[in-house]
Amino acid sequence: VKEQSVRRGNFLMFFSNGYRFRKYMKAILIGLPTWFVIGILINQSDRFAKVMYGSTTLDSGRSIMFAYVAISIGDILVGFVCQWLKSRKKGLLIFYILCVVSAFLFFSPLNSNDSVMYAICALLGFSTGFWAIFVTMGAEQFGTNLRATAATTIPNMVRGSLPLMNLLFLTLFQKSWGWPLIKSGILTGIIVMLISSVAYYYTEETYHKDLNYTE
């Protein structure tokens, strides 16, 4: 790359070409469920617990702790899963399914006390352990001269999407439309998963991709 007359690490290159921009957006959108789970379900688990089963003792800080311990385990395991399946997309799909199942349990009648809530938050955390693979997939969408820039900016774009999710969850659904907490959480989750699933479908498989090229 140093010997070639190509621009290196230029963030604006993601927006100067339609095909490259679409790849960049898809790489961001496949990671949205992570921050819906962490930023809304787990971070506000004390609010959900109070509405769902009347708890005033649940500590959202403990929910976050259990979730991040499980995320660490998921981050390690997803790499082995993708290696075994010889596919990044199949590994990501498995964790997407786990995420949907965990969210279903979160909103189900089974979530009826603090101990169960903590366990479900841990399961939600584990299911979002695809963070490592989603970042890897995003970086591998691009040539050598943009790969590091993609790997560092894509996760930050996903983190930055949380205020947009809160615009739906809190500002629009609850404050403007007067929806209850549970209904707002479920519909926000459905919208996020639908967007990510469409992006996933159109995202290129990178497991066997030759990465020796530049943009």
Where are these regions (language model features)?
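Intracellular juxtamembrane helix-capping segments at the cytosolic ends
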Residues: 129-142
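Hydrophobic core of transmembrane alpha-helices in multi-pass small-molecule transporters
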Residues: 115-129
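Helix-to-loop junctions at the C-terminal end of transmembrane segments
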Residues: 74-87
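Extracytoplasmic gate region of multi-pass secondary transporters
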Residues: 20-72, 162-166
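A late C-terminal transmembrane helix in Major Facilitator Superfamily
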Residues: 139-175
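C-terminal ends and interior cores of transmembrane alpha-helices
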Residues: 97-111
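Cytoplasmic membrane-interface "Motif A"-like loop-to-helix N-cap segments
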Residues: 84-96
